[in-house]
Each structure stands twice: as structure tokens, then as C-alpha cells.
Amino acid sequence: DHGKVIFNLTASFQRPSPGLAHQVPMPDLMPPEECRDFLETIAADPGVSEESFAHMARRRPFELRNHRPAADAQATQHYQWFRIAAPVGDDPLIHRAFLAFASDMGLLSSAMLPHGLNWSTPGLFSTSLDHAMWFHADIRVDEWFVYVMDSDWSGGSRGINRGSIYRQ
């Protein structure tokens, strides 16, 4: 980007090995079949401008199903079901790459929820300053996953957002 560094990556790897295992259980959520399609959700939101709708309605590689609390709920958590919309083969690295891509969909809006804001809010500027991700096992993005996103804090024109991705 004009000779300036805009991306820095630190990665570490491990060979699969046996050992102790546990994880935080997936929250009790509505299944994807009961959630609204992403485009239906944003089309029904009177706060989304035509320009923002056109941007958000662009073609994506994923089928998305949303559950967003009402704008006046001051919620700090929302979730989105997703799966790849077209076959991508069996290469586990391709599946991980698509999961990494999906991890950036919707996360920033978590800090907007408690304030009743959305991407159409005039004067709002939003970008990721850093992003960390851990892959604990092989996955297939042609299965349903749910991305549970929340924001613990916002202030000083910054917000902290976090997400956990669970297999259905």
C-alpha cells in the first residue's frame, strides 16, 4: 500500500499430538434453519442506508444466517451461522483459509451493538487494529459453524471484540 507495511503476521505450528482436551461448550443458540438470512436481516433494518445495503449485499463466498438483537436492546453479543456456498475441495489449508476469512465477518459490529449503531451510521469509521486466531483442529467450511461475537468494552473511539467459532 504505497510502500507502507499494512500487514504483519506471526504464525506458529504444531504437529497433531495426543493429550488432554476440553473446550467451553457452545452456547444454546437457535439453529441456522431458524435464523434469518443475512440479506433479509439487513434489508429489514430501517437504519441501513441504500449505499450500505448495496455494499453488504455484494456476493460473498458464504451462506450467512444472522441473529442480531434489537438495536435498543444494548446487547453486547450476537451470532452468525455460516458455511461455504460452493464446493472448495478437500484441502484442509483451503478450509482453514476460508475460516480465517469468515472470522472477520461481523466481528467489528459487536462494539456497535450496545450503542444502537450500525455500518450506516454517519461519520462512523471502523477497522481492525489487530486480529488473532487459533486453529485447534481440522475443519470443513462446508459444514455449518456459528460465530458467537461479543464486545467486553468500548471507549476512547476504540472497542474490544472477541469471537468464538463452534461447529454445529
Where are the regions that the model predicts?
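Terminal targeting signals and extreme-terminal segments of soluble enzymes
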Residues: 2-168
